[in-house]
A protein has these predicted regions:
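Acidic-enriched, low-complexity/disordered segments with a strong bias for Aspartate over Glutamate
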Residues: 5, 14-15, 24, 35, ...
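Short, exposed beta-strand/loop patches in secreted or surface proteins that constitute
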Residues: 54-58
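Short, surface-exposed beta-edge/turn micro-motifs
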Residues: 51-52, 62
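A signal for specific C-terminal beta-sheet/loop modules enriched in small/flexible residues
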Residues: 2, 6-7, 28-38, 75-95, ...
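Charge-rich, low-complexity N-terminal segments
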Residues: 1-51
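Negatively charged, Asp/Glu-rich surface segments that serve as flexible interaction/assembly modules
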Residues: 59-127
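Generic alpha-helical propensity signal that fires on short helical segments
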Residues: 26-31, 96, 145, 153-155
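C-terminal charged interaction modules
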Residues: 104-156
Length: 156
């Protein structure tokens, strides 16, 4: 089994779960999917090999990860409660960051970007922790997946 077998080859965000977003947020969503598919490590527990497809949706206020692969099909549901604080803070700082890009000084933009990255790291580490028994992810994969989870939470 090659290490590259444990990877995502497709990612779908459930249309019914998606919130209306700004152009900046939509662009970030598309970049995250592109980057995720270009390079990732995604190894579901109990699966011998990939590659895998992933559909991300919200079901009754929980995050649903539908994973399919050769001889593998499973849905993992995660409570969003542990993510609420970091999602709220991340959304607020992103909104400030997008506003700052248009109007603020480079120093203000840099400060907001540092805060945004810090919260993004916190959210992706929490995602890795919550999925630890279900799916093994590398740091970059967790970061890109966290971006997509945020996309489901943003309310334009």
């Amino acid at each position: 089994m090659a290490v590259s077998d444990h990877r995502l080859q497709s990612v779908i965000l459930d249309d019914e779960s998606l919130a209306a977003v700004s152009r900046d947020q939509e662009q970030e969503r598309q970049i995250a999917i592109f980057d995720l598919l270009e390079e990732n490590h995604f190894a579901p527990a109990g699966s011998e090999r990939g590659p895998y497809g992933l559909k991300i949706s919200l079901i009754d206020g929980r995050l649903a990860l539908d994973i399919t692969g050769p001889s593998y099909e499973r849905r993992h549901l995660l409570s969003l409660s542990p993510f609420r604080g970091v999602l709220k803070d991340y959304r607020m700082i992103c909104e400030s960051y997008y506003d700052a890009i248009r109007n603020a000084t480079p120093q203000k933009i840099e400060a907001l970007d540092m805060g945004r990255r810090g919260l993004h790291n916190e959210g992706s580490a929490l995602l890795q922790q919550r999925l630890a028994e279900k799916v093994e992810l590398d740091v970059d994969t967790a970061r890109r997946l966290f971006t997509l989870i945020c996309a489901l939470q943003w309310r334009g």
